[in-house]
Amino acid sequence: MPKYYCEYCDIYLTHSSPVGRRQHIHGRKHISAKIEYFQNLLREEGITPQNFLGFLNNRNINNPLGNPMMNYMNPNMYMKYNPMKSYHSYSMRSSHPYRLNIHNNKYSRAGYVPPSHHKYSVNPMHNNYHQAHNNYSYPNSINPSNQINYSNNYGSNNFNNSNEFNKNMNEKDNINNNDIHDNKVKTDENDPINNDNLNNTRNFSYEENHYSTDHKKPSFLNPENSKEHIESDIS
């Protein structure tokens, strides 16, 4: 069995078992050699702490080392530049062939938001941008920003509808009040109530005249006639 070679320490390990490799990787000598290796690499590239951020911004996106997502397409890239770590791909052992190597922690979940950040942005331009560029939402799903806009629009519509309803009711009340006032001031001869009262008065006077004229009997409305009529009935 070939012995394991450490590129950072430039030695062959006496014990090539996983336990021996783990002990060597956590050893002080290996850590110091690894730090020195990367310091020399940065010095050769001309990278200093002052221009390190600029170097990160100017990286080529197609570079597998600059773009970590490229490592999922070619899992051997990590082993090519890091021979110390034994290669055991989680995605190859998984039953799902398209499952990526994503650890199950709270920071890798899709809906995780740090406590100091708002889950929904308060900037309307930010929400509109994400709505226009959100190509991964399902057709039947509603974005949280859409729900907020929908609730605001629904509430404003209800408020406007209630105002219109109250306005219409007030107009109807004013019309009814004006009609009642006009009826009190003016007496309409075509009004059925007035006609009934007028007819009753006419009928009463007609009956009185008819009774007193045709039958030649005194009217009951005259007090003297009523007295004579009562005395005649008694006798």
From Swiss-Prot:
GO molecular function, one term: pre-mRNA 5'-splice site binding
Amino acid composition bias (Basic and acidic residues), ranges on this chain: 169-189, 205-217, 225-235
InterPro entries: Matrin/U1-C_Znf_C2H2, Matrin/U1-like-C_Znf_C2H2, U1-CZ_Znf_C2H2, U1_snRNP-C, Znf_C2H2_sf
SMART domains noted in UniProt: ZnF_U1 (SM00451)
Subcellular location field: Nucleus
UniProt keyword Zinc-finger, yes or no: yes
Biological process annotations from GO: mRNA 5'-splice site recognition; spliceosomal snRNP assembly
A single Gene Ontology CC term: U2-type prespliceosome
Entries under SUPFAM superfamilies matching the protein: beta-beta-alpha zinc fingers (SSF57667)
Low complexity composition-biased segments: 134-168, 192-203
Keywords: Metal-binding, Nucleus, Ribonucleoprotein, RNA-binding, Zinc, Zinc-finger
Family recorded in the similarity comment: Belongs to the U1 small nuclear ribonucleoprotein C family.
Protein role: Component of the spliceosomal U1 snRNP, which is essential for recognition of the pre-mRNA 5' splice-site and the subsequent assembly of the spliceosome. U1-C is directly involved in initial 5' splice-site recognition for both constitutive and regulated alternative splicing. The interaction with the 5' splice-site seems to precede base-pairing between the pre-mRNA and the U1 snRNA. Stimulates commitment or early (E) complex formation by stabilizing the base pairing of the 5' end of the U1 snRNA and the 5' splice-site region.
Protein name per its UniProtKB record: U1 small nuclear ribonucleoprotein C
Species assigned in the record: Plasmodium falciparum (isolate 3D7)
